[in-house]
Amino acid sequence: MNNIKLIAVLIFVVGCSSESPQSKFESLLDSEWSKIVNDNPVYASSMGDLSQNTEWSDTSVENIYSDHQHQLDVLSQLDELDISDFSDDNKVNYLLFKQQYENSIESHAYKTFLIPFSHRGGIQLQHETTSIVPFRNKQHYLDWIERISKIDVLVDAAIEKGKIGIAEEIVPPRFLMQKVYKQIELQAFVKPKDSPFYRTFLEMDRSINKIETEEIQKKALNVIKSKVIPAYVKLHRFFKDEYLPACRTPIGIKEIKNGKEYYEFLARKFTTTNLTPKEIHEIGLAEVARIRDEMNAIINEVKWDGTFKSFLDDLRTNPKFYYETSEELFESYLATSKRIDPELVKLFKVLPSMPYGLKPIPMESAPDTTTAYYQRPAADGSRAGYYYVNLYRPEVRPKYEIEVLSVHEAMPGHHLQIALAMELDLPNFRKYGGITAFVEGWGLYSERLGYDLGLYKDPYSRFGQLTYDMWRAIRLVVDTGMHYFDWSRQDAINYFLDNSAKTKQDVMNEVDRYINWPGQALAYKIGQLKILELRAKAESELGDNFDIKDFHHEVLKRGALPLDILEEYINQWIEEESN
């Protein structure tokens, strides 16, 4: 009997020790993905995993440091693997997975996790989580009530980080936090029935009968009154007494400790290149000049009798370019999307099976946020992708931007690219993750595809497309200007207004977004320029054999990639097609 046990142990040990490096890597991918899902209950709920549907993530400082140590351990495991026998696909997976951990580890050193507040999202807008978690039956509503009963844990963790940030002088600009302060007031000083957290209980799923609905609503009101509102009152007091007075006046991230080095890192991370902030700034200036020339050509075409500035002023103020109501604006977005969708077969071999819809941006965040954004579908197919549009003040949302915005956020932009990636046979970290330079570069590249889709038929719509291209070129200039050089917020606003037809409301919200999220805005134009460069090369070298459907398929069929790896794949495809 003992001999049999010994043989079994030996077989087990030999079996374990003979596991190939590739198998170890694939096991590591699986275990790390499981950890990501387990550590992020809201994300898990959004993906269709409801095993922790009553929980929040542990956002404490202690857990952040624990995660950091875990990432160091994972990186050590990756360094020990011999990848020489990996498949070509797994060599790419290894590179991307390792880069992800290296970036996270490098970012940790700058301690910006001690800035837990953003006017664009976060603890004070936690009710917006309802847009990504399910509410299809009674239990889902009860789960949400239990989840929000623990909101004080999130608030306490945010306050803890804020206090340490004050002590270490890692704090955000005060004027942005004044926006957060006002958003907190909307949570702290309301009657329970007027709380943003109660809104989801006003129109409940039809499968729930009237008696159950009333019971759930009563429970929700009790929790909002006893747990949610007191937590926000506490946060409001912290902001008023401690945080706002300690926030910094300068806007650039260079003002924190080692801030210039941090911004250089962010430039590399978001663009997936080794471009320096100075080089990116120069690229931006060149793009602004190029697009300005194209804009002037349209101004001449419409026989405008005035200056560039006066033309922009007319676009911003002439009532003919704006809808009077939010309802009219939303209907125009819907109609535009319906016109685009049937035309996509002209440019793409494969379209995603998951549909998308349109929704207004929630009223609490609309005044302080940008024109639109996209939300990916649920992994289990229970929720479509959504294109969110800003209906706040329709008098500053021009008609000539609707087409270009729609192709960027929905089809053939973000929804097409992201929903397709979710259907690919890729590791989960690639299927559900994203590389900003690729994702946003594709979105911006898609704006030019509007011409092929029958859009931009009048000069003003074409000027709208150029306005959006200019917008992303300006980002390269003002983001680097504010965070790396010595630009003020007003410098950035003035440069924006001088070179684009974006309205002042949009411009201020955009500039504030860049201040809040340094480096991210660099990805769009850098990514677009690379895709355009690769398309031009393919068209030149393949000549009559170039097929736009094939090119798009090659760009999209592996999901989001760093720009250098995308270039390798496209060059390989060009060579194969040439032969």
Each language-model region and where it sits:
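Sec-dependent signal peptide recognition
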Residues: 2-9
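Hydrophobic h-region of N-terminal signal peptides that target proteins for export
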Residues: 10-18
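N-terminal maturation segment of proteins
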Residues: 17-579
